[in-house]
Amino acid sequence: MTSFVNFQSRCDRLQHYEVRYPSHAIIKAVFVPSGSAETVGASHPKAMIMDSYNFMTPINENQTLYFWFQLRNFSPGDAALSKVMDDGVRAAFAEDRRVLAAVHEGFKNQATQSLDLATDRAPLTFRKQLARMIAAENSGP
């Protein structure tokens, strides 16, 4: 596939992850000409931005609806690019669903204590905060 960036140099990629409790994730990917990420970032006139939004809505203890969409600020009328990106995003989110389902099964049938790795700090922090929120909700007013 041809590169979709609108500049000739290598690029810097900025990634922003945000979680909104209990179940929203927002990911912003910014591509700018190499060397400009620290000075102008997303405000660069040639910045190419892709935003992804994930929404998980529990139905019950074992079922969750998973919605997502992605936006971009470049080539809005390019149907071929839209298809390539849509296919890629669908494949990525389908993979996420399989992983999330496997993680859920693992937690449901957990026989040993979790191994907390430093690289897992963000999801561990998320789970701990969510557990505190659930406990507070279940404890009543």
Over which residues does each language-model region extend?
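C-terminal catalytic domain of Rieske-type non-heme iron oxygenases
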Residues: 1-141
